[in-house]
Amino acid sequence: MSDMRKPSNVRISRWLQRTPVDTFGMCPLLISPSIKPSRRDLLFLAGGAALVSVAGGPHHARAQTAGADKLKIATIGAGREGGALGALLVKAGHPVMFSSRHPEQLKDMVTGLGPLAKASTVAEAVAFGDVVLLVVPYTAVAEIGKEHGTGLAQKKLVIDVSNPIARRDGEDFVKQVDAEGGAGLATQKALPGAHIVRAFNAINFDQLAELAHRQGEPAVPIAGDDKDALALATTLIKEIGLEPVMVGGLAMGKYLVWGGPFTGVHTPAQVKEIASTLK
């Protein structure tokens, strides 16, 4: 039986097994068949399979067509978080172009998500998208700004999902980001002129599918200074079945990080209460 005729989770698992680490894409670790998978590895596999399940599976995806009013979405980074977010946007009817340094390694993922999903280089994705999701290790943000800053400044919205993480990026780097005002202001400095909103920074990638359209209004804290960009981010987040909650300007972006006060699943009221205690 060919890969295309196998269940979607089998194809995605094979994709995960043969996809190496990618600096921009943050792809899952290579899992050798000769090595017994750890619990963390199995979580990676579950997260990868969810990329197809949140889009309704390949049979559902083939029937999808983008409406004339649907914005084109690009992801810079197509690993766990970028893949999960992009899949939800595909399900909402948006054409999504996933990008990485090695777009050929994304073939199985985009095939499983259906005709609205494409894979490309970062440059092609930036040219394609009306909205860009920035989902990379935070150390790559400055480099992306140098290479693609002009193009990103022309977009309606750049959603900054990237986080500075000490264990990955180094303690000195995180201190440098903090000295620049934290994530958010540091992203704006790296991408001058871009219409930036920080969002999805404190939610586990493997929670996204189960939270979408769930009762109880699971909240997504957002921060930004651009009124139009915030309005657009609000619309997109609602489209994928989550509830955006404004917590302040980009200066509040320093709190929208994994391990920060907004980490986990909260109701809108809880997010507002947490935000009221912060400066």
Spans of features found by a protein language model:
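Intrinsically disordered, low-complexity segments enriched in serine/proline and basic residues
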Residues: 2-5, 10-11, 24
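N-terminal secretory signal peptides and thylakoid transit peptides that target proteins
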Residues: 15, 22-49
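Redox-cofactor binding/interface segments in oxidoreductases and associated redox assembly factors
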Residues: 133-137, 159-160, 198
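Conserved N-terminal Rossmann-fold NAD(P) cofactor-binding segment
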Residues: 67-70, 91-131, 135-151
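Internal alpha-helical scaffold of NAD(P)-dependent oxidoreductase catalytic cores
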Residues: 120, 182, 189-196, 214-253, ...
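Rossmann-fold NAD(P)-binding glycine/threonine-rich loop
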Residues: 162-196
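NAD(P)+-binding Rossmann beta1-loop-alpha1 motif at the extreme N-terminus of oxidoreductases
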Residues: 41-108
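Short, conserved loop/helix-junction motifs that constitute active-site signature segments
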Residues: 148-155, 191, 214
